[in-house]
Amino acid sequence: MNSLWMGNLEPYMDEDFICRAFAQMGETVVKIRLIRDKITGKNAGYGFVELADDTAVERCLRKVNGKPLPGATPPKRFKLSRSNYGKQGESSTFSLFVSDLTPDVDDGMLYEFFHYHFSSCCSGKIVLDANGHSKCCGFVSFESEREQKRALVDLQGATGLGKKALRLSLASSRVNKKKESSENQIWQYHSDSKNASFINQYYYPQNLSYLSTYDWNYSLDYLNPSQNTTPVDVTQSEQTEDDDLEYPDSEINVTEANETFMAQSEELYSALIGCFFQPPESWDGVTCSASSYLPEPINQYEMEDSCSSNWVTT
């Protein structure tokens, strides 16, 4: 399309104002489409400018972009870029960050310098402060990743743009950042799922029957809110309903439990005591796996003899 995206517009800037501004820059506008606020009806700060051909688009990006906007109050600059209006999806671009620029370099000069060396350069943008003055740095975008990397090497320290040698570094476009962020989060979700499966396999007690019914090898395929929510065809996995799960009864009758414990203790004590009074003839074939640390019982007759002897002595 032979159109440009134009931003940095004030509410009073209408179609006639933009046509006059381009005419003073030596360009003829074919059509203008301003995006307006649905409530106030004023322009939303940006729009689309259609030119005669692609040559005019290239010329505006080189000669007009970044220049002062005629008749603008307060002072504004042309803010132009290639238009994606009417295209499906977002085009992927590869960017470089350019620093050590001088204040006289504008968007058009930045774009023209890099486009002269690499034809896939599609835009140049100077970073401005709140007052519209250059921060002496900017960004250039390429349609080819190969030429982006070549420019990083070939034009590192190059001169001819401003009064200083250029310093270049890689920069990620918003589209690539958004894609990379969503991929990293999906990877992180799957990684957390695998870690949870490993930990549950080796560190959770397996003798708890009420926990053994759960499947620890679950997958966390959550949708990141920042991702594109375009509907896609997916095969939904079967979900296990927990209506039939039995949960342990947490209520305990303490009194009844204590009585049961005491009764079992009395039975054990009686059984152990009874073992000492069994005649040796009944020990054949009998084994006992319980160990007793109770003191040996004193015979009743021995106790009476001991008491009698003590009384006589007295």
Swiss-Prot record:
GO terms for cellular component: cytosol; nucleus. Residues 2-85, 94-173 form the RRM domain. Disulfide bonds: none annotated. The lineage of its organism: Eukaryota, Metazoa, Chordata, Craniata, Vertebrata. One of its GO terms (biological process) is mRNA splice site recognition. It is found in: Nucleus; Cytoplasm. SUPFAM superfamilies: RNA-binding domain, RBD. Involved in the early steps of selenocysteine biosynthesis and tRNA(Sec) charging to the later steps resulting in the cotranslational incorporation of selenocysteine into selenoproteins. This is tRNA selenocysteine 1-associated protein 1. The keyword ATP-binding does not apply. Belongs to the RRM TRSPAP family. Pfam families: RRM_1, Trnau1ap. SMART domains: RRM. GO terms for molecular function: mRNA binding. Keywords: Cytoplasm, Nucleus, Protein biosynthesis, Repeat, RNA-binding.
